Amino acid sequence: MAAAAAGAGSGPWAAQEKQFPPALLSFFIYNPRFGPREGQEENKILFYHPNEVEKNEKIRNVGLCEAIVQFTRTFSPSKPAKSLHTQKNRQFFNEPEENFWMVMVVRNPIIEKQSKDGKPVIEYQEEELLDKVYSSVLRQCYSMYKLFNGTFLKAMEDGGVKLLKERLEKFFHRYLQTLHLQSCDLLDIFGGISFFPLDKMTYLKIQSFINRMEESLNIVKYTAFLYNDQLIWSGLEQDDMRILYKYLTTSLFPRHIEPELAGRDSPIRAEMPGNLQHYGRFLTGPLNLNDPDAKCRFPKIFVNTDDTYEELHLIVYKAMSAAVCFMIDASVHPTLDFCRRLDSIVGPQLTVLASDICEQFNINKRMSGSEKEPQFKFIYFNHMNLAEKSTVHMRKTPSVSLTSVHPDLMKILGDINSDFTRVDEDEEIIVKAMSDYWVVGKKSDRRELYVILNQKNANLIEVNEEVKKLCATQFNNIFFLD
């Protein structure tokens, strides 16, 4: 067990300070093999943001990154450069496929103070950015690109460098606008999945529903079922599901919240055969099934890219708080008739199922009792099944990460996680922050638990007891080493 003091208060100068969060300065992708000779350097650059940057500066920046990678390769041939720290910014490197390099340059947070003569003084917060967080964000950029476009190599095989450049431009031009670097934290490192807690009977109902749907709609290859933005069941491989889950919960679902709230009180189609009301609708695909000219276009996704390399249509269908993803082979083109059939089969059953889940969830909530606000917040992650649970985050979307704790405490959580990465053994770290909060990190059997306690008069022994109590109540079926 290790104990330490960390964190800083806001200080007397806070009122005169202006704070600027980290910001994306540039993002580029290059392949050194594409322009090996002098005068061909521009050919190496496959994508560069911002595009307005002058050509020679782009070539210079890419050349510098190449030199850094080559230099660090002499010390670590298999794992060259990961990040480069400077006073004003930090550069992150990732080689997702052989010779394809992605680089993200992030400006360090800035504090602007007034000097005695009234002139602004800029201070760069060099130690505020956590390498692990932003390296994870860069890896996510590739994973999200790969989900919708396949690998870089696939684009090269399909249409050479020209097609790859087009795909990179089309995807990253939009995707980089959704990167809100000030909201990135420990959850980005984990890239986990929040699972919805269910009793056995309701879980069996969902399993039965999925089996019936896959049988009725026999072209469905994989299915995933979510409720309240939390996963209940998935037929995909873990790594494919984690990135699809991120897309659904931070991009697709938030875009459809407004229309859902507006139409919540009345079924979308009240007149159904057999008088079954249903609230089902497509989140991808046709907007209006009654329009004979409605387009049945669904986004394509690529899964199992290391193995069988499958290209699929992604059909996302939602009723109330329940969403089901049907994935069908891309060689099959869904017609309007198929969409109407899916709507008539899935809609009523999913509506009933969503009501059942909601009812069961409320019963379980009442049985557990409405306790007063606990004196602790926690983040839990299981590396084996990617399960993630956080009471620190009230809401996590790309544009905002509403955390109920101070950023200083989030930074300590990240520092503890970095310490955990350096050792393979199970361990526990306890930190007393300057703000009098206690922060505890436990790593045991490929699981990690981070607890923030608001008990300033507690000592180490009492803090340890509180964490044991938390483990007993919140994680009673999970074994944490003492």
Swiss-Prot record:
UniProt modified residues of type Phosphoserine: 76, 266
The entry's keywords: Acetylation, Guanine-nucleotide releasing factor, Lysosome, Membrane, Phosphoprotein
GO cellular component, one term: cytosol
Top-level taxon of the source organism: Eukaryota
Location relative to the cell: Lysosome membrane
Keyword Acetylation: yes
GO biological process, any: vesicle-mediated transport
Pfam families: Intu_longin_1 (PF19031), Intu_longin_2 (PF19032), Intu_longin_3 (PF19033)
InterPro entries assigned: Ccz1, CCZ1/INTU/HSP4_longin_1, CCZ1/INTU/HSP4_longin_3, CCZ1/INTU_longin_2
Modified sites of kind N-acetylalanine: 2
GO molecular function: guanyl-nucleotide exchange factor activity
Description of how the protein assembles with itself and partners: Interacts with MON1A. Found in a complex with RMC1, CCZ1, MON1A and MON1B.
Role played: Acts in concert with MON1A, as a guanine exchange factor (GEF) for RAB7, promotes the exchange of GDP to GTP, converting it from an inactive GDP-bound form into an active GTP-bound form.
Recorded family membership: Belongs to the CCZ1 family.
Stated name of the protein: Vacuolar fusion protein CCZ1 homolog
Gene: CCZ1
